[in-house]
């Protein structure tokens, strides 16, 4: 029986990825988080160029905070405070 080969890209290489993601955190843990659907500037911090919401592993939000953010972004899109898709991608 042949020994199993390890697939390329598996193993110790993941540590550098986690360090890179840790430096991209958007919110400090000490600050109280409140999302208002009318606050366009604050919501746009959590939306990328394509109009997609940035995931929690990058933003550093808790599950509860990410859920509040999701509802605020969806409501702001519904009321046309922020666009669903950026003008570049239409």
From Swiss-Prot:
Keyword annotations from UniProtKB, A to Z: Ribonucleoprotein, Ribosomal protein, RNA-binding, rRNA-binding
Matches recorded under InterPro entries: Ribosomal_bS18, Ribosomal_bS18_sf
Residues covered by region (Disordered): 1-24
GO BP: translation
Coiled-coil residues: none
Pfam families for this protein: Ribosomal_S18
Domain of life: Bacteria
GO cellular component, one term: cytosolic small ribosomal subunit
A GO molecular-function annotation: small ribosomal subunit rRNA binding
The family this protein is said to belong to: Belongs to the bacterial ribosomal protein bS18 family.
Task performed by this protein: Binds as a heterodimer with protein bS6 to the central domain of the 16S rRNA, where it helps stabilize the platform of the 30S subunit.
Subunit architecture: Part of the 30S ribosomal subunit. Forms a tight heterodimer with protein bS6.
UniProt name for this protein: Small ribosomal subunit protein bS18
Taxonomic source organism: Chlorobium phaeovibrioides (strain DSM 265 / 1930)
Gene that encodes it: rpsR
């Amino acid at each position: 029986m042949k020994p199993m080969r390890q697939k390329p890209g598996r193993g110790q290489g993941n540590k550098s990825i986690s360090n890179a993601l840790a430096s991209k955190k958007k919110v400090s843990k000490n600050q109280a988080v409140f999302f208002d659907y009318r606050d366009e500037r604050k919501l746009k911090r959590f939306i990328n160029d394509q109009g997609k919401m940035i995931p929690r592993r990058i933003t550093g939000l808790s599950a509860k905070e990410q859920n509040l953010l999701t509802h605020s972004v969806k409501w702001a899109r519904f009321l046309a405070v922020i666009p669903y898709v950026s003008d570049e991608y239409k």
